[in-house]
Each structure stands twice: as C-alpha cells, then as structure tokens.
Amino acid sequence: MQRSNHTVTEFILLGFTTDPGMQLGLFVVFLGVYSLTVVGNSTLIVLICNDSHLHTPMYFVVGNLSFLDLWYSSVYTPKILVICISEDKSISFAGCLCQFFFSAGLAYSECCLLAAMAYDRYVAISKPLLYAQAMSIKLCALLVAVSYCGGFINSSIITKKTFSFNFCCENIIDDFFCDLLPLVKLACGEKGCYKFLMYFLLASNVICPAVLILASYLFIITSVLRISSSQGRLKAFSTCSSHLTSVTLYYGSILYIYALPRSSYSFDMDKIVSTFYTEVLPMLNPMIYSLRNKDVKEALKKLLP
C-alpha cells in the first residue's frame, strides 16, 4: 500500500477459506463448473447458429444470453482458480477495476436481456399470428444492442465513481472478486452521493427490468386464462417455464445481495449467493433452456454423429 498518496496499488482477495485441503477441493469444483459452463453455452450457441429451425427471435435472444453467461463466468473463474491454488491472493488495481467494470456491465445487460425475453414470450402467447411481424430480427437485434449499450454505459459510470475513492484504510477484500459492497466498505471519504448513485442504478438497471418482466407475465397470465382448452393453457405456461425459472434464480440472487437492508447483511452469505449467480447459474441456463425443448434436442441430434 502506498501511504504517500493514501491509496492502494493492489487488493488482496480473501476468497472462501485458508485451509489448503478445502482450497484444492474448491479448485476442482470451480474448474468442473466452469468447464460445464463453457461446453453448455458454447454448444447452445453453435446449435442456434447452425440449425435453421432455431433462427427465430426467441433463440436469437437465448443465444445472446448464452454468450453473455459465457463471458460473465469468464470474468470471475480464472482468478478464482488462481486464488484456490496459489499463495498469491492479490489482484492489481487495474485488474480489479476491469473485473468490476465487466461484471457490472454484464449483470446490468443480463437484466435487460431477461426483460426482452419476457416481452418475446408475451408476444408469442398473446399474438401468435402476428409474432413474426411483431418480433422481427431487427427488433431483437435492437433490444440486444440496447441491453449491452445501456449495461456498459451505466457500468462505466459506477466504475468511475467507485475507483475515484481513496482506499486509505485497508486493501483486503473479504470476497473472491472485486464486488461493489466490499469495495465501498474499504473506501474513504463522503459516500452520500455515491449511495444515491448506487441505488439509482440499481433501480434503473435491475428494478425497472424486473417491473417490465412482472408486467409481461401479468399480460401473459391474462392471455392464457382466455385459452379455452386446458391443454392449450398448459402448453402456454410450459413455453414460459424456462424463462421464469432463470429470472427467479437470477433476480433472487441479485436482489438478496444489493437490495437487502444493511442491518441483515453478511459477507459470508454474500459469497455463497454471489457464487450462485456468477458461477452456478451460467452453468444451469443452457440446461434450463434446452432440457424440455424439442427443437434444441433435435438440433443436437443433427449435430452429433
């Protein structure tokens, strides 16, 4: 730590444990999870690109979600693996900044993508005859582009504000990556304006997409209840089940960490929940979107010899 300018040149990531046996076990687990994430998401992207039956608005967005999950997991896992097997737990100031920027940008983008998918499901169920016109590839591309651009613009704002603080107290982060809350805890100076910005971005990038998702599902439920046959209603709900599962798991994790009152906040619980949405969920998403999907299964059969 450089005392002359009262800031730090690197941070120390404590990770999960200091026990060598546990660290080795965690290394094997995280390597296995990351391998499945890479294989699952890469396979889904290849299937969507290669099979003409999957060249639809829904799969266009699903493919982008797989790409995002692949990128998202890759932001964290290499450093986690190093922390698990190396005595050097440090990450440079620049490395921490980059990890923070990409993790925030991808998290914001995923919230918007999930909202776009909810709208896609609403159009598919409520206006099936006009689906191709209402959800054109151009519109899907625009929704994806807005999701990424909006996510990373907002990420650049919070990143610049976060790393403009002086970290003059300690450089030890009680986490396995450079997350917002542990960094804010280390920062010195007035944080009133920062907290306002933090909650504003939380509201605009997480809560607003969540409201849009809820609104879409309210309209979906209304449309489904108008379907006369029980088989038709079941098929309509089945169409939304994979997306609803993904939304519940992702938003449940995000809101638990960032919207929970500070009086009940725990860094240990934060690590567990963060592990779920940064490592486990990107691995599960390809399974969630493909296990019950006949089109994906057929495309996989064609791809395999």
From Swiss-Prot:
Q: Which Pfam families match?
A: 7tm_4
Q: Which GO terms describe its molecular function?
A: G protein-coupled receptor activity; olfactory receptor activity
Q: What spans does the record annotate as topological domain Extracellular, numbered to this chain?
A: 1-27, 86-96, 160-200, 261-271
**SUPFAM superfamilies named among the record's database cross-references:** Family A G protein-coupled receptor-like
Q: Which PROSITE patterns match?
A: G_PROTEIN_RECEP_F1_1 (PS00237), G_PROTEIN_RECEP_F1_2 (PS50262)
Q: Where do glycans attach?
A: 5
Q: Which family, according to the similarity comment?
A: Belongs to the G-protein coupled receptor 1 family.
Can you name this protein? Olfactory receptor 9G9
Q: Gene name on record?
A: OR9G9
